[in-house]
């Protein structure tokens, strides 16, 4: 289990750009590349998040708490919304949303590697002075990570 803080203007499954419409993915993998023969489909959680508003004519949907490409309204499954921005108001980055996440994976072995990463698409993450602001546009942080072992006989 862990707390995931989603900062800024995540766009969910689609970003609304007329070209190169790509999702903002967040990925959790168990044992990535440790066992190249094994099917990793059950050891991977791929989802999207959206901090966008949702109106009848404009709504950038997210997958969470389901796997991508499932569609839910923005901020579905959140624990807390409208937390402080990660950056000052000099950039348009949005608020922070907290998700308390619990995931389980089957595993047998003496060691485990858990990898958390994103595939964010940020073509417009440039401030008024032309400086790239990726962290302020879309980023995330993790807190309170707990790994538990449950033994089944």
Task: Describe every region a protein language model picked out.
Residues 11-30, 137-141:
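Short coil-to-beta strand junction motifs in C2/discoidin
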Residues 2, 18, 132-134:
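Alpha-helical protein-protein interaction elements
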Residues 56-57, 61-152:
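Terminal, low-complexity interaction segments
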Residues 19-81:
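Extracellular ligand-binding interfaces
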Residues 5-22, 54, 122-125:
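Extended, low-complexity, turn-rich repeat/linker tracts enriched in Gly/Pro/Ser/Thr and Asp/Glu
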Residues 12-16, 36, 148:
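A generic structural micro-environment signature
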Residues 5-7, 29-33, 50, 117, ...:
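Predominantly extracellular/luminal cell-surface or secreted proteins
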Residues 1-2, 6-9, 108-113:
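Extended extracellular/luminal ectodomain segments enriched in beta-structured repeat modules
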């Amino acid at each position: 289990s862990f707390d995931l803080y989603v900062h800024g203007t995540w766009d969910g499954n689609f970003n609304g750009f007329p070209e190169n419409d790509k999702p903002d993915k967040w990925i959790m993998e168990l044992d990535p590349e440790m066992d190249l023969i094994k099917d990793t489909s059950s050891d991977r959680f791929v989802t999207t998040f959206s901090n966008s508003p949702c109106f009848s004519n404009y709504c950038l949907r997210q997958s969470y708490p389901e796997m991508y490409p499932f569609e839910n309204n923005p901020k579905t499954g959140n624990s807390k919304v409208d937390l402080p921005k990660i950056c000052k108001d000099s950039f348009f980055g949005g608020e922070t949303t907290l998700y308390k996440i619990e995931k389980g994976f089957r595993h047998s072995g003496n060691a485990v590697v858990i990898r958390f990463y994103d595939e964010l698409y940020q073509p417009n993450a440039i401030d008024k002075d032309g400086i790239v602001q990726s962290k302020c546009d879309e980023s995330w942080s993790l807190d309170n990570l707990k790994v538990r072992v449950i033994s089944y006989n």
